[in-house]
Amino acid sequence: MSRRPDLLRGSVVATVAATFLLFIFPPNVESTVEKQALFRFKNRLDDSHNILQSWKPSDSPCVFRGITCDPLSGEVIGISLGNVNLSGTISPSISALTKLSTLSLPSNFISGRIPPEIVNCKNLKVLNLTSNRLSGTIPNLSPLKSLEILDISGNFLNGEFQSWIGNMNQLVSLGLGNNHYEEGIIPESIGGLKKLTWLFLARSNLTGKIPNSIFDLNALDTFDIANNAISDDFPILISRLVNLTKIELFNNSLTGKIPPEIKNLTRLREFDISSNQLSGVLPEELGVLKELRVFHCHENNFTGEFPSGFGDLSHLTSLSIYRNNFSGEFPVNIGRFSPLDTVDISENEFTGPFPRFLCQNKKLQFLLALQNEFSGEIPRSYGECKSLLRLRINNNRLSGQVVEGFWSLPLAKMIDLSDNELTGEVSPQIGLSTELSQLILQNNRFSGKIPRELGRLTNIERIYLSNNNLSGEIPMEVGDLKELSSLHLENNSLTGFIPKELKNCVKLVDLNLAKNFLTGEIPNSLSQIASLNSLDFSGNRLTGEIPASLVKLKLSFIDLSGNQLSGRIPPDLLAVGGSTAFSRNEKLCVDKENAKTNQNLGLSICSGYQNVKRNSSLDGTLLFLALAIVVVVLVSGLFALRYRVVKIRELDSENRDINKADAKWKIASFHQMELDVDEICRLDEDHVIGSGSAGKVYRVDLKKGGGTVAVKWLKRGGGEEGDGTEVSVAEMEILGKIRHRNVLKLYACLVGRGSRYLVFEFMENGNLYQALGNNIKGGLPELDWLKRYKIAVGAAKGIAYLHHDCCPPIIHRDIKSSNILLDGDYESKIADFGVAKVADKGYEWSCVAGTHGYMAPELAYSFKATEKSDVYSFGVVLLELVTGLRPMEDEFGEGKDIVDYVYSQIQQDPRNLQNVLDKQVLSTYIEESMIRVLKMGLLCTTKLPNLRPSMREVVRKLDDADPCVSNSQDTTGKITV
């Protein structure tokens, strides 16, 4: 008891001390709140790459990756996590970070809405959410009075273009472009942002005029309203914005002329007014803009001579003026004092000599001057232009010999001198252009031999030397070109044999050696080029028989006419090329069974004695040999028959318990392939690679090195007489005769015992539907645009073959992305002919085939499927490829499909086409290609069948959309090379 007062006294002292310490050092409640907010923020994100693994509950937020704290208070003031593959959504908990001044999450995959609670971050100065997948309307951010940088461009935001933006008068940078707003005008209130230096409103569905209030933004440095539908005359008031360094007005509907007052913009570095409706003569005053680096005015209606003052500019790097009506001589000094790297002056009416100084500073990479009227020789100075990557000066009137150094461009990917009047030889120096992928020299007057040095161009894909005066033999070194896909040497004076080494060109698709003086036989080794699709040897002096092995190829075109060939025409080749492909070969003949389909076409029927020489001694010898063979065959046959009888008895004894109702297997084999029936029919459920209402697909690895095949087991009845089996086999035989690299190869059909099996070639990369949904390392899509384009072209060619080159034509009736298979090189193959029909059996069926989302609208009220029904379905596939969307998605709305969605998005306005492109693969240099494919998809899905193109037209248009060959601007106004 005596100790209690002391204890009490000690307790009081401790309490007082603790209170004092709490007063001096209060607990960091703020830090706890911030940490909780940050972890709620983290939990709403999908961090598949573990970028936020340093965020640990035991640590201070100040050591978290991407977090910045105030050095004095320790409070969180910044979140910066750009381009780190984050997905998920932004948590409203961000509003608890009241001291936050920077929220920067650009270039991720974040979706959902911008949380309106963000306005509670009153100290926010930087809000950067550009290049994500945010959707919904923009919340009213005007309470953020301190905001200086607002960039939410490059998302999927919608709704109206908000006028409250004009109340944020501290803004220095404003980026709202590349979103999906409703059509609207630029609000006048933007003129109140007096501190604004950067304004980005491109692709915002804007219409109407540029409000005059914008021309009061005296601090403005960058003005970008490209890719809208802004109309009216070019604004003369823009000359008041003397601090401008960049003007982007491309792809609008501006009219009128460029005013001479443009000279006031003395700081201007980039000026892009391309793809409008501007006209008149460009003012000479443009030549006084000494800081100009980029000038693009392509795709307008400008006329007259191009301003000579551009020749005095010393900083100009990019000049793009194609598709106008400029005339006269091109200013001689352009490039003399400036470091040009890109020049496109194509599709004008320039005359006179070709400009001399475009590569004066040895930095020119892209030179496109096609389709003008330039004449004379190519200036010798270009022989030293080793920086060139892409050269296209075709379709002019250039003449004379090409300077030697011009052939050796070590970095060039493409050289196109076609459709001129150039002479001389193709120099052996061409072998030094080792990066070349396309050499296009057709329609000139080149002579001499094809240089052997072409064999050094190991990256070459296309060689076009047709319609010249070339002579000599085709060099065997061409066989070293492993990447070659097209070789056109037609209409020259080439002699000698077709080189056997061509078999080594394993990617060759298109081979044309027509109209030369080639002799000898067609090499049997050509059948080893599995990719070969088009073969033209017409108009030569070839002899011998047509190699039967050529039927192994997946040819869609063949022409051997006008030679001296003899012997039997393989029926499969006759089916591909028709009799005209073999005409003017007097010694060629067709089998009797093929004669009916080739009546009156000048082909004789093969005789069994056609090749026997008629001298008596040989006849006697042959007769003796024939009798000897008959005797041997008879004796052998007797032994074989006896052996077979014994074996049959043994088998009958072994199998006497087998159900007598089991039918024998009927095997229809369409390719030379060793198949074991038991191996095909003993399917393992572990190897199922696909299934549907019609049956299952199995992967089967054949023994004896037979490779891998896909076996489709079809559900069906018991196979009784009259159940349709005979018809099915007949149709399978038609499909089995198809020979096209873009149609899945059917090896065999097995029917019997109540089952039916189809044996197909195996496709390593599955189907297009799956591939479009796959991502690879880094979150990138498996299919970039180059792969998607390749798939589109291949599939189109396959369907075109079915429609136009098969006899009778075949209507697929179920074209869809899951029926387009992909091999190891992403070559597409049309597959699944379960509902396909040959056209000559009638166009009307008792039920509608096809898949919802792909079916043409006319099939809703008619069973008359036609080729145009397939075209519609293929159009849906094209829309899948360019948008990355599925045919049916919830976001389209009830009862809506991808066709409805795309049409509603562009609102019949072609200037909004970019809004529906898949941003995962979209880039400046392939945008034009994507838009062309999109337009073809829209044309194919036109409601009226008669307005849809044929598949041949589709193929032709898709060829024009090649992203690797485009010679013009993309629709963003950026140059496409």
Curated annotation (Swiss-Prot):
It comes from the Eukaryota. GO terms for biological process: nitrate import; regulation of root development; regulation of shoot system development; response to mannitol; response to nitrate starvation; response to osmotic stress. It is found in: Cell membrane. One of its GO terms (cellular component) is plasma membrane. Expressed in mature leaves, primary roots, and the root tips of both primary and lateral roots. LRR repeats lie at residues 97-121, 122-146, 148-167, 168-192, 193-217, 219-241, 242-265, 266-288, 290-312, 313-338, 340-361, 363-385, 386-409, 411-433, 434-457, 458-481, 482-504, 506-529, 530-553, 555-576. Receptor kinase involved in the perception of C-terminally encoded plant signaling peptide (CEP) and subsequent regulation of root and shoot development. Together with CEPR1, mediates systemic nitrogen (N)-demand signaling upon the perception of root-derived peptides (e.g. CEP1) via the up-regulation of genes involved in N uptake and assimilation pathways. Interacts with the root-derived peptide CEP1. Binds to the ammonium transporter AMT1-1. This is Receptor protein-tyrosine kinase CEPR2. The gene is CEPR2.
